[in-house]
Each structure stands twice: as C-alpha cells, then as structure tokens.
Swiss-Prot record:
Keyword Cell membrane: no
Identification of the protein by name: Triplex capsid protein 1
Keyword Ribosomal protein attributed: no
Pfam families in UniProt: Herpes_VP19C
Assembly with partners or alone: Interacts with TRX2, MCP and capsid vertex component 2/CVC2.
GO CC term, one of those recorded: viral capsid
Known function: Structural component of the T=16 icosahedral capsid. The capsid is composed of pentamers and hexamers of major capsid protein/MCP, which are linked together by heterotrimers called triplexes. These triplexes are formed by a single molecule of triplex protein 1/TRX1 and two copies of triplex protein 2/TRX2. Additionally, TRX1 is required for efficient transport of TRX2 to the nucleus, which is the site of capsid assembly.
Protein keywords: Capsid protein, Host nucleus, Virion
Gene Ontology annotations of biological process type: viral capsid assembly
Stated family: Belongs to the herpesviridae TRX1 protein family.
Amino acid sequence: MDARAVAKRPRDPADEDNELVTALKAKREVNTISVRYLYHADHQALTARFFVPEGLVEFEAQPGALLIRMETGCDSPRHLYISLYLLGIRASNVSASTRCLLESVYTASAARAALQWLDLGPHLLHRRLETLGCVKTVSLGITSLLTCVMRGYLYNTLKTEVFALMIPKDMYLTWEETRGRLQYVYLIIVYDYDGPETRPGIYVLTSSIAHWQTLVDVARGKFARERCSFVNRRITRPRQIPLCTGVIQKLGWCLADDIHTSFLVHKELKLSVVRLDNFSVELGDFREFV
C-alpha cells in the first residue's frame, strides 16, 4: 500500500497514542474550564511575593494577616512590609492590654524601627500606607518570603482550604446587625486631632452597605467626636489645616455566617481575634471623608 494512503487513513480509536491524546485533552479541560467549580468558588487568585525581615514576621507566620506597605521616608529602606497586628500598636482604639501583648511580641529591632517610622512621618498615616492583600503562605528565614493574595480567595497550595482574614478583636467594628448574608469588609482610619499629636483610630468594618455615599454618611455620624476635633483644628490652627477626618478602603467581602471570634496563639501568647472565614480579597483605594 502506498505510504501516502496509509498516512491519510483514519486512526484506530483503540490506538494507544490516540488514547493518550484524548486523556491529555480531558485533563486540559479540567484545568481550564471545570476547575472553578471543584471547590464551589473561583480560585484563580492574583498573588505576589514579598521579602520581609525576620523581626517583622511574628503573628504573620500564620495565614490571614492583612499586609500593608509603608513608606519610611528614608533612602534605605524606602518601604517596609508590615501587618495590621504591628499597626495596631499605634492605634488609639486598641486597649492597653492588647497593646502590651503586641509590644511583647514585636521586640526585634526591625519592628521597633518600623514603629519609629510610623511616629515620625510628616504626613497623615494613610498617605504613607498601601494595602497589598492577605498573607497566604510564609517561608521563614532571616529574610522571610511572604506570599500575599491581592485579589481572590485565600486558598492553600492544594486549593482544598480557604484561609480566614484575622483581625485583632479591638480593631473589629460593626454598625448594624448582620441581616443580609453578604458582608462587605472595609478598612477605616479616623484621626483624632485633640491634643498635640494626631492619633489614628484603625478599624476593620463589616457592613451590608455597598453604596459609598451611604457608607460615608453613616461614618460621619459614628465618628462625630473626631469630626468635631477636625473642625476645631481648622478654626484654632488655620495654618495647620488637616486633610480629612478619615479614610475608608474596601478590603473585600465574606458571608455573615462566616464571622467568628477566635484566638491566635504565638509564643504561648493568645491574641483575641475576629475570624472572617472564606474571605475574598477585593481591594479598593483609600477614599477620604470630612
């Protein structure tokens, strides 16, 4: 038989090579189309990796920490990667007992330097911060490698578990009963201008409110005292006009049934936290309000 005729002859379905091609094709379909339905959510998350000094990785060694990039104002290092736990040491709404617990954990020189840069910055706090996302995995070392989810769910490596967003209990805030199932998560920084130093209050809010202007109207009513200090500063010190009363940034969303209280254990110390299970990262920009 002519070789060209043999080449044009249809392949036998029982041929081993043909079976291999069929199997590979089916596997590609699973990896591309059907994969988002395997765990009842789309796990095609956007991730990034950051190198962090060992002294800044304490509670951050466990998944779920909110990671923030801070401008130092120096040539080296220009940026530091800190978490909400370290930022809570300088939050005015954190209780003295929680602050002492956090200070007893973050005793390394890198953590102390980060706290000094937080205090000495010339601008309002949110002008020097950029929220990056949530920590998923950590490779510990002298310089630790943190894998951060910037958009999507906090899946583990095998995509079989969704990690929770961990918030210190003193920094958690809610304004209404969880009537609806969907809860939007916001980061709120509010400034208190009473006294010689401007003190920031840092909160993580869960709310069913999605409309921006409605959220701002509620925030103005809840933080009436801080707004009065803002107006008083503008009247008494017109040359030192503050920029705003506070800022709001969207972090993502979760379900009302997935909000629980828990403990975070590190070096035999227990930190009371609020755990947002099945949290999905969906970052927005800092938006100021007065």
